[in-house]
Amino acid sequence: MTRLMCLLMSLSIFVRGFDSQFVDMSPASNASECLESQVDAAAFSKLVWPYPIDPAKVDGIIYPLGRTYSNITLEYTGLFPLQGDLGMQYLYSVSHAVGNDGDPTKAYISNYSLLVNDFDNGFVVRIGAAANSTGTIVISPSVNTKIKKAYPAFILGSSLTNTSAGKPLYANYSLTIIPDGCGTVLHAFYCILKPRTGNRCPSGSDYNAYFIYETIHSDCQSTINRNASLNSFKSFFDLVNCTFFNSWDITADETKEWFGITQDTQGVHLHSSRKGDLYGGNMFRFATLPVYEGIKYYTVIPRSFRSKANKREAWAAFYVYKLHQLTYLLDFSVDGYIRRAIDCGHDDLSQLHCSYTSFEVDTGVYSVSSYEASATGTFIEQPNVTECDFSPMLTGVAPQVYNFKRLVFSNCNYNLTKLLSLFAVDEFSCNGISPDAIARGCYSTLTVDYFAYPLSMKSYIRPGSAGNIPLYNYKQSFANPTCRVMASVPDNVTITKPGAYGYISKCSRLTGVNQDIETPLYINPGEYSICRDFAPLGFSEDGQVFKRTLTQFEGGGLLIGVGTRVPMTANLEMGFVISVQYGTGTDSVCPMLDLGDSLTITNRLGKCVDYSLYGVTGRGVFQNCTAVGVKQQRFVYDSFDNLVGYYSDDGNYYCVRPCVSVPVSVIYDKSTNLHATLFGSVACEHVTTMMSQFSRLTQSNLRRRDSNTPLQTAVGCVIGLSNNSLVVSDCKLPLGQSLCAVPPVSMFRSYSASQFQLAVLNYTSPIVVTPINSSGFTAAIPTNFSFSLTQEYIETSIQKVTVDCKQYVCNGFTRCEKLLVEYGQFCSKINQALHGANLRQDESVYSLYSNIKTTSTQTLEYGLNGDFNLTLLQVPQIGGSSYRSAIEDLLFDKVTIADPGYMQGYDDCMKQGPQSARDLICAQYVSGYKVLPPLYDPNMEAAYTSSLLGSIAGAGWTAGLSSFAAIPFAQSMFYRLNGVGITQQVLSENQKLIANKFNQALGAMQTGFTTSNLAFSKVQDAVNANAQALSKLASELSNTFGAISSSISDILARLDTVEQDAQIDRLINGRLTSLNAFVSQQLVRSETAARSAQLASDKVNECVKSQSKRNGFCGSGTHIVSFVVNAPNGFYFFHVGYVPTNYTNVTAAYGLCNHNNPPLCIAPIDGYFITNQTTTYSVDTEWYYTGSSFFKPEPITQANSRYVSSDVKFEKLENNLPPPLLENSTDVDFKDELEEFFKNVTSHGPNFAEISKINTTLLDLSDEMAILQEVVKQLNDSYIDLKELGNYTYYNKWPWYIWLGFIAGLVALLLCVFFLLCCTGCGTSCLGKMKCKNCCDSYEEYDVEKIHVH
């Protein structure tokens, strides 16, 4: 059990010598020379066994001092090694041995004593990592043996010197830590190491290296030599003036352990894992050494084990890891020990765990920090003018304090350091600025007040003093940053000192008849006393009085002053008050600097640089731009007081943009433990230093990334992601813009990879399914409807916002971030709250899409199942019997007239016989009147004309009896006039329909435009809400919250450390309050959007995919169909329905019961029972059923009622219940309205692309909504709609002579064609009976004269 316990006990040994201040380190070594050594660094360095720091195994972690934790995970900032650090490997070896007897005469070591390392924050040591295993002996690489643990030895100091050969040695006091007693003792002493002069010693000849050694066979046997290594060290150095010597016992074992050394103002601290957690790795402080001088360097002392040749052993390497100020995530077990840890600055995955203070992170996309480009240079522009002339301060007689002199400088360069170096400064105090900042800033003016003043009275001039100096002589103004310098003037400065110091001790005005009323006249800050105008330049005696009588114009009275004289000192003593005023312009006062090439901006365009422009400092990117603003004003600012443009001295206008700073997200898959990094909304070409990204969380650069091949996507630059053109329908890692990260273990079995793959989300359109009846209940039942279209916008998500808390509050300034630590886990809670809101968004959107997504789509006619007649929606089929052919239209005259409704019957009757004889027989009846069409064809004209003429001609021959032949003509005229009258009546009725129907249409249009206005207004509010919130948050950055400036850079540049903390703390408080309000608003909006997303899902499923029975849920009135399209941050619905326009009031009951015992009751289904509209109740009252959405009484049947239990609200009936009849259909046919609506409607599903990029541009739909409002106004002034009369087309057949002429013409045409084709041409015979003889004449022959060619 002893080996399992912490046995490192404090056995501090203090040995006092002759001097009480020092301890006695005797005996000194009596060796005349130092042991010989062979330094073979190559042999030690070629053996490499890497042991990187693994925080998961608690490597190198020093337990927090003075506190403990149990069963908790937290972030802790302190001194830790870097995760993955390989450290420096050191190895000890055995010595040379001649034989098996005697001591080896030569040590075999590496060159460790020649290497000096920076101590910085300290280091930790891994000891015995390979103990108990088999390894190589360095001196004999071919021999393997069991490895033993070896403790390291160190020298630590603050100053160095060299030997004559140029080898480093420690000077002055040094802390030496030496293991001894064969691993059972640890010595620590603080002495001056004086090199010994013997042979092979540091100050002697043939010096090679110093080291320590033990002789195994003699020092490590039954009696352990506790000082063997110490004595060997004394052979190289004499230990002089040692202030302490401590020793600690160690249990000898081969257990691996950790050892650490740190330093602070309390001294040097030693830490060990043996004290409290021997096998766990937690290091606890076990000693604090009184070493207060800052340690700068350390050296590993070589160590050699002298052994016999046949008993050599291998010694485990130890590893030294530097400590850094880091943030670690620590996991404390129930017993209080650290069992897991993560270096928050190691990589993006580590940062993810630390951002959410958890070792277990679920699969998702997380916002963790921000990437900010580092400055690559400096650009300075300031007046290139002469040096400010301070010579008046250095010549002449120094003025008295009441007659101080003032110098105001502008348009010059000052050297305040050079000025103050001329004086012996006794006090330098500032207000609103630091002494260092006032000497290196640019100002619009610099003012210096100077005067002779004894340093013995400097307390009277300090702020808050109420003595005579601030009352009557000089009062420092604090309106602007100011510094006060009290100094004495050396003899080599030419300024002349006055005979004595003097000041005004009294300045009053005497008034009254006897001048007995005295009024003190005090001065204002920075102003002269009124008594100064008539006071002497110096007072000849102490208490000297001086007066001046005021004129009547000045108000009368007497001014009286008293002067006090102070003896002059040996050297003139003076006071200087320096005040500066901030501003910008070409006449600024700037320090004299060696600018080098910082004046050139041309080679820095497009790069992130630190700039100082006439006193305006910052960091940004300069680009050539089109000039804006007033050139004389030089600087162009935005509404948040940020510099956006600058007119340079080279004549160009440069835009100033912030350096790249973008949010960084980590894509993490828990099942594979893989991650990728997303730089939001930035091109990869702008992220030039991504491999050394600065982490606001850890205040350091992230040191590792697994991939250096970034992939450009629509959402930003991603590393750790490859693009294989995948398409998925389900995504657990949405990136936005319809992009998804797919882990290596994907849904595709044939696919595997070692990193994430980029995929595109593919959503299908929702389908239209069978509609169901609408439902509702109202006392007034609709009897007529109008067609309405309602538009509705539902916000389903808000833009994801991630605010880097530290970046927002501190803008990257380390001083601010250190103060922010005092606010605890506030920033972590902010990040967690925003991430929670973003996860809530992802969950609600994913749930929404999952609920509304369908796997297939159908056309309209297949999607609308049931008793729907969709023939009206189809293209009419040409060729039916109801259509005339094209030949008939060509051969007959066609006349189309208005048809009041009887033309078709008349036409069918006329086809049954001769039309001229059946005209009167085919007369039609309309409302009791016989009617005929108002048209005659030629046959009927001939018949009626012949009848009329015959009756007239024969009237004289037949004594009027032939007049009866005119009766058919008269009847024909009467019936046709009746037809004209009936047509006029129908036209009159249609005029009424025109007014009524179009008025209804206009009402629906007005309602539609009104809902469009409301919907657009909601879209505008939803889109602008995020931009307005971000603008408000950004505007708070310009709020000073009571500090001297809203810029931390200005505060750091102007104030000292104490004042910086107070001013920055005000900004932190204010900005955290603003950020907290913003986060609270985001959480509320996120929850509201999530609830709205559920509502949108319900509406898609109930309104778009089916017909809703809820009145008013899917638009106004009775729902018919709805459509949805994508809109910013939500869905835009178009609901189509019927809105009642007329109602009838009926007497209704909730149910009906008889008087049986128990009573038998029935209740209506989707309607209610109504009476027969009688005015009184009686036994014979008849009850009917009507639907609640349309008034149409019908008998009570099994289809419209059901049996229920009795209820007091049901109507009691005296008679028996009517027996239910068979089902009676009461469907209402809306095919006309459906035809008009579906005629030009195209429905498709929305593109469910996630909107991830924050848009701070405000959406303004006011103009569009104003236009819609004007349309509504104009619709109120115009009404028209037409109901078209039925058309009748009449074909009039041609008479016989027209047909005869038509046939003759055709015969003539055919003969002409025949003779042209068959009876023309030479030798042609027509039908073999005609022959052409001389129809082809031959041509005459001519003699042709021959032509001879010579």
From Swiss-Prot:
Q: Where in the cell is it found?
A: Virion membrane; Host endoplasmic reticulum-Golgi intermediate compartment membrane; Host cell membrane
Q: Where is the BetaCoV S1-NTD domain?
A: 21-356
Q: What is this protein called?
A: Spike glycoprotein
Grouped into one coarse class, the protein's main location is virion
Stretches in topological domain Cytoplasmic: 1317-1350
Q: Where is this region: Fusion peptide 2?
A: 904-926
Question: Which segments cross the bilayer?
Answer: 1296-1316
Q: Where is this region: Heptad repeat 2?
A: 1245-1284
Q: Which residues form the signal peptide?
A: 1-12
